[in-house]
Amino acid sequence: MQQRRPVRRALLSVSDKAGIVEFAQALSARGVELLSTGGTARLLADKGLPVTEVSDYTGFPEMMDGRVKTLHPKVHGGILGRRGQDDGIMEQHGIAPIDMVVVNLYPFAQTVAREGCSLEDAVENIDIGGPTMVRSAAKNHKDVAIVVKSSDYDAIIKEMDSNDGSLTLDTRFDLAIKAFEHTAAYDSMIANYFGSMVPAYHGESKEAAGRFPRTLNLNFIKKQDMRYGENSHQQAAFYIEENVQEASVATAQQVQGKALSYNNIADTDAALECVKEFSEPACVIVKHANPCGVAVSTSILDAYDRAYKTDPTSAFGGIIAFNRELDAETAQAIISRQFVEVIIAPSASEDALKITAAKQNVRVLTCGQWAERVPGLDFKRVNGGLLVQDRDLGMVTEGELRVVSKRQPTEQELRDALFCWKVAKFVKSNAIVYAKENMTIGIGAGQMSRVYSAKIAGIKAGDEGLEVKGSAMASDAFFPFRDGIDAAAAVGVSCVIQPGGSIRDDEVIAAADEHGIAMIFTDMRHFRH
């Protein structure tokens, strides 16, 4: 049984007024009495809607600069009153039932994100009456509908039209879930803000102790359930942030192909984040979260051709990311050459999509353009805990590099060094990348000793018939011994870029000088685990 409840009286009080006028007009046209507060009431009245101010309804004025508006028994009694059980007491005290509450809360997150936001500003944007009404209505969802998202307005009107002005219990319950999610997220933001302050009133700190709250409250929204997780015996789902500020796999639209798997999403994220490092047309091919081929060129077609040549074997069944629109010529080259799981790009031309449609299982995602990287937090789950750190958005510029060898790098070596340094940032540690003329020619990933990553990168280049002589080598962290330099010299590397910082730096630099290798220090490490 659906337990329909008619909507005869609604209270509307919103900070985000998108769509509220149209929704109120639709409710009023269906005979719903409108109650409202402050700016919402004035907006509705200005649009010619019959609306009663809550202060007139309760006989009690708004006070304390708007801090007290709706905290009144006529409001909360009307919301919390149980139909058929509390009718007598409601009638005795002149409390009319309120059947729908439409509320969204003061913009606390936007306020504290503003430059120069003071504690006083933040405090004044902590909503009290709003969450109280939301929780009251959600608690009494058997009788009351609570609406916190403007995206639900149209569906609510449609259901009312289908049910003689009523909403079903299933709908009211779903709306109540959204309401509790909304208030939980809101309180989490406030707790995180206050918890990030140093242990003193009004204290503010940019240090780590103040950057991270005492209790970390996180809110993510489920985007999709998955067939399984990393392995078939693991259940999984994909959750995303509510307001993602940067083009990402979380914001991407799937325009073709089967549902994304857990591993597809993880690998696509790795590919997309890597390709974002480049301003020139670039292609990144990823397998098992590691780049197996990266190149930049004058077109994405040539970039793809060159990235593929790094390691065609590993590229099979891989993820391909571009930082330019996917065009028909590039799409045809991919489909004709290899099996691919996912292609992601800022956009895709209609002709490109016609070509990829021939391979219906190929997943094609478009993520939109990105202007800049947005600071945020990275999380790593450990048994019983969570490691939290800033996103690794660091990247050195040419002017920040230090040449520590006797020989200076040539202009081409310097370009190749900066190129493979960007790639090494996204390769699992210990990471070694060989590159020549803006193309990776060998990648050694995830080895327990750095020298073996160097050897593997050389072996891979040799297996594909790529010329290592005169290439640059990037290492995501310092060389603890000279053996990595010796291994690079043995295959013809002529320039090495690395963070430096080892207690044996002098020995490592001496090895570079011995082999005539130019060595560059970045003074920035890029471990990736």
Curated annotation (Swiss-Prot):
Pfam family, one: MGS
Annotated metabolic or biological route of this protein: Purine metabolism; IMP biosynthesis via de novo pathway; 5-formamido-1-(5-phospho-D-ribosyl)imidazole-4-carboxamide from 5-amino-1-(5-phospho-D-ribosyl)imidazole-4-carboxamide (10-formyl THF route): step 1/1; Purine metabolism; IMP biosynthesis via de novo pathway; IMP from 5-formamido-1-(5-phospho-D-ribosyl)imidazole-4-carboxamide: step 1/1
Example GO biological process: 'de novo' IMP biosynthetic process
GO-annotated cellular components: cytosol
Disulfide bonds: none
Keyword terms of this UniProt record: Hydrolase, Multifunctional enzyme, Purine biosynthesis, Transferase
Domain MGS-like positions: 1-148
UniProt catalytic activity: (6R)-10-formyltetrahydrofolate + 5-amino-1-(5-phospho-beta-D-ribosyl)imidazole-4-carboxamide = 5-formamido-1-(5-phospho-D-ribosyl)imidazole-4-carboxamide + (6S)-5,6,7,8-tetrahydrofolate; IMP + H2O = 5-formamido-1-(5-phospho-D-ribosyl)imidazole-4-carboxamide
UniProt GO MF annotations: IMP cyclohydrolase activity; phosphoribosylaminoimidazolecarboxamide formyltransferase activity
EC number annotated for this UniProt entry: 2.1.2.3, 3.5.4.10
Stated family: Belongs to the PurH family.
Swiss-Prot/TrEMBL domain comment: The IMP cyclohydrolase activity resides in the N-terminal region.
Alphabetical list of NCBIfam families matching this protein: PRK00881.1, purH
Name of protein: Bifunctional purine biosynthesis protein PurH
Organism of origin: Citrobacter koseri (strain ATCC BAA-895 / CDC 4225-83 / SGSC4696)
